[in-house]
Amino acid sequence: MIELKNVSKVFTTKKGNVEALKSTSLQVKKGEVFGIIGYSGAGKSTLIRCVNLLEKPTTGNIIVNEQDLTTLSTKELAKARQKIGMIFQGFNLLKTVTVYENIALPLRLAGVPKLEIEKRVEKYLRIVDLFNRKDAYPSELSGGQKQRVAIARALSHEPEVLLSDEATSALDPETTDSILDLLLKINEEIGITILLITHEMNVIQRICDRVAVMEHGAVVESGTVKDIFTNPQHVTTKKFVNSAFAAKIPAEVQKELQRTGEIVTLSFIGNSSGEPALAVATKRFQVYPNILSGNITQLKHEAYGKLVIHMQGEQNEINHALSFLQEQGIIVEGGRTDYGKQVLFG
């Protein structure tokens, strides 16, 4: 559906050339929600703007719907862009016209027949649950409602791809969740492919199927959201994963606790998150776990949790208990054994 092949982007400034993208390649499958996450300056905004050629790449190929956009004429590119919708952090609504007209006007400019315009505007305003505000002006809407209008406008052209450029970063947490739920609903009901960029791990974990992590203009790690959460490799990825869990154990506390036992991080995914495996382990083996911190969250359609424990007991008993937990589908990290390299909350 979307493929970037060795895409680079160099901006020329008074101080010299700035390489915003460095030979970046990635693939987005048809019908999935693909997230790109990175800190400010990572290159994610440049990347997503290259997908519809709002930014023309310096080198590389952009393939969308089996068309290499970098080879198209101006007329051909304009036609191809009709199948690529985009929403932004700023809503870009026309302040002097109604919600209805904000959606209808671009369709008129595109030459869509009047009856078809009426049909589409009603259809997509109902999808975003704003049909009852069709005669309102943008100044009368909340931030979340404005973004819903922007989403309806993008969908009214009936694209196959929807690009989201930090669409929720200006919204409060509750409104962000409602917009994410709406995007997930659109993906599941309409089947549209969504490519989004964000600096918030909450966005990735709530609606994405796969994710790419960017740093300094390059993709440093990518995979399914489940794999990224349960087995992050790059240091930047680990920071993002840890940001989803508020707990942090001070180094001094860790050092003191490690004198009397092992600090272990247990990760639960899917069905294992609801099983009393730790309780069973304490009955089966002579180990005494003390819970230091814990959290459970949702990765799109399955639960994911982390539990940091201080486990006391004879080393042999601890080893057997941790092996038992792994057999129950729990990911075990930390401690003095080879169950993991480090405690993620350290």
From Swiss-Prot:
Domain of life: Bacteria
Claim: Nucleotide-binding is one of the keywords in the record: yes
Cited Gene3D superfamilies: 3.30.70.260, P-loop containing nucleotide triphosphate hydrolases (3.40.50.300)
Location within or outside the cell: Cell membrane
GO molecular function: ABC-type D-methionine transporter activity; ATP binding; ATP hydrolysis activity
Reaction(s) this enzyme catalyzes, per UniProt: L-methionine(out) + ATP + H2O = L-methionine(in) + ADP + phosphate + H(+); D-methionine(out) + ATP + H2O = D-methionine(in) + ADP + phosphate + H(+)
Transmembrane segments annotated in the record for this chain: none
Keyword line: Amino-acid transport, ATP-binding, Cell membrane, Membrane, Nucleotide-binding, Translocase, Transport
EC identifiers of the protein: 7.4.2.11
Xref: InterPro entries: AAA+_ATPase, ABC_transporter-like_ATP-bd, ABC_transporter-like_CS, ACT-like_dom_sf, MetN_ABC, MetN_ABC_transporter-like, NIL_domain, P-loop_NTPase
Domain ABC transporter positions: 2-241
Assigned GO CC terms: plasma membrane
Residues the entry annotates as binding ATP: 38-45
Protein topology in the membrane: Peripheral membrane protein
Subunit annotation: The complex is composed of two ATP-binding proteins (MetN), two transmembrane proteins (MetI) and a solute-binding protein (MetQ).
Function as written in the Swiss-Prot or TrEMBL entry: Part of the ABC transporter complex MetNIQ involved in methionine import. Responsible for energy coupling to the transport system.
Family in the record: Belongs to the ABC transporter superfamily. Methionine importer (TC 3.A.1.24) family.
Name the UniProt record assigns to this protein: Methionine import ATP-binding protein MetN 1
